[in-house]
Amino acid sequence: RDSSTSRGLGDVYKRQGCEYVIRFKVPESSEIKCKDFLKGTVQVSSNTLDDKVLYKSDGNPTYHFANVVDDLDMKISHVIRGEEWLPSLPLHSLIYSAFKQKEPIFIHLPLILKPQGKGKLSKRDGEKFGFPVFPISWKEGDLEIKGFREEGYLPEAVLNFLALLGWNPGNDEEFFLINDLIKSFSLDALNKSSARFDPKKNLWFNQRHIKSIKNSKLEELLIGELERNKTSFDKNKIPNIVSLIKNRLSVTTNIFETTSYFFSDPKDFDFKFLKKFEASEAKTLLSLSASIIANSDFNKTEIIKENLEELAYKRGVSFGKFLGLFRVALIGKLAGADLFETMKLIGKETVLKRLLNLSGLIG
């Protein structure tokens, strides 16, 4: 027990005009038994507990006292917190007993561990490993770390991910919409052991939830990003663009980058891929492709595809490799939305311009 505790000296301090605190008088030499929903019975000797301060010398209550009073006032039925607060349970239990009040159900959840599985996840880990750990951004001095919101994570995705860190649905199901999660969740299925924070799995959940949200939400987001970046656009094309790229989004914050080639010509090109072609052959393929496009009806993409496939065959190039060249010319990279749907959205004139532009850049 804390030797600095001065029991029974309150009146002396008052008469002398000394500053004093009010402590909780822990019973001596007794066994304190508390109940935790996950841990079961927690038993400690009262001799290991200090007489904790309830009121500080300035008259303000401490956390422990205010916590219990607040929960009593609000008629809290369940206290759910991290297991690092388990050592406070005996004191809180004693305070409830002193008030002659029934304790709420205490549930001390296991910790969330670092990605490596060792040690509690901390806010610094986000900065260190490059992923968010807070709901929103936070500042500490000159340091600012982005939260899930700023990094483009949906609230329902983070909730889904976190729920499965500490709860087992009893089957292999992982993806839950909020209403389904509410129906399925049970305190009886909470995990007792700590879980590792997997940022890749968190990203996977976010991608799944982006696929499930209404397109209109992404349309609003994209329009906002286009306006913020002062990019001109045809509002009538936005729904079709969102439908094309929705399944490619892993975070909402990259929607502008993911759709940029629909609104402006690419400035960077995958020259590593282009090196698979002889320069003269690449220029010829691009030129002949432009001729096909110039004489095509853009409402008949199947015919365009057949004509381009025939061109590749005649030039002795696999159609897959040829389409890679075509795609790099249009969007600058190999990965992107459906090529022929993209062509229809950006229009014949833009397709021709981009084909000839890349041809001119090839040495």
Give residue ranges: language-model regions.
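Single conserved hydrophobic/aromatic residue that forms the stacking wall/gate
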Residues: 1-13
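Histidine-centered active-site/metal-ligand motif
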Residues: 2, 64, 92, 108-109, ...
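Structured secondary-structure scaffolds
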Residues: 11-98, 284, 288, 330
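Conserved hydrophobic residues forming the short capping helix/wall of the S-adenosyl-L-methionine
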Residues: 96, 226, 312
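Catalytic adenosine-cofactor/nucleotide-binding cores of aminoacyl-tRNA synthetases and other
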Residues: 100-269, 275, 331-363
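C-terminal accessory/binding modules appended to enzymatic or scaffolding proteins
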Residues: 219, 277-330, 335
